[in-house]
Structure formats: structure tokens, C-alpha cells
């Protein structure tokens, strides 16, 4: 037998059986440290959270035939609106019943929530609340 040839018994004896769960490098995942986006205390749990661009309020129960101008007229009383997003139903072309209204400052968004919640817009009482809130601190256990 030459130097290039190997006995089958030697190969079988030195082989490791893989269980098909990824590379061996993935076992070191516990040692990797990740950046934390935002540390939240229990005191700020449920508090509003700023989006990347501004403070967004979530308006629900909007009449299906409302237009962007109707929503803009209603919510521009509380401050300068940066953006309004209305989702349309593709099949009917009507609103899905909610809107996202973005303000520059938290004060303007707070005023919009406090003064326009449960008010009338085209014959329906709209509900207004924060779009993003800080969640509860989890222990990491399931």
C-alpha cells in the first residue's frame, strides 16, 4: 500500500458523525456579545417611543370613505404634520380603517392623542393612541 492510500477502517475510526445542525462555529454563539438598542427600565415600560423620524400616533376607526385631506384637517390643529400614511384595501379602494400620523415633537403628538381621542370624524368616533411604545422588560426565559 502506498502513502496516498488509506485503509477504510482508519477513515471510519477518525470520522465524526454530524447531526446536521449547522457548522461547529455556531456552537460559540453564547460567547458573542450583541449591541443593545435601548435599555428600558420598568418605570418607562409602556411609555411612548420615538420612531426614527418623529412621533407617530395610530388612529383607528376611520370611516372607509375618508380622504387624506379629511385626516390632515382633523389632526393639523394640534401641530405640524410631517407625514400621514393611509392604507387602502386593494380590492375595494377604500381605507382599511386606520391611519398613521407623524408629528415632529412629542408635545404635538400628546396633544393630538389627548384632544382627538373619541372625537367625531365623518360620523365615526376615532380612537387615537401611540403607534410605538416601549415594551415590558423580559427575563429572557420562556
UniProtKB/Swiss-Prot annotation:
Residues 1-26 are annotated as: Disordered. The keyword Cytoplasm applies. Keywords: Cytoplasm, mRNA processing, mRNA splicing, mRNA transport, Nucleus, RNA-binding, Transport. It is found in: Cytoplasm; Nucleus; Nucleus speckle. Its main location: cytoplasm. GO terms for biological process: embryonic morphogenesis; feminization of hermaphroditic germ-line; mRNA processing; mRNA transport; nuclear mRNA surveillance; positive regulation of oogenesis; RNA splicing. Residues 55-133 form the RRM domain. One of its GO terms (molecular function) is mRNA binding. Signal peptide: none annotated. Residues 1-10 have a biased composition (Acidic residues). Heterodimer with mag-1/MAGOH. Part of the mRNA splicing-dependent exon junction complex (EJC) complex; the core complex contains CASC3, EIF4A3, mag-1/MAGOH and rnp-4/RBM8A. Interacts with rsr-1/SRm160. This is RNA-binding protein rnp-4. The lineage of its organism: Eukaryota, Metazoa, Ecdysozoa, Nematoda, Chromadorea.
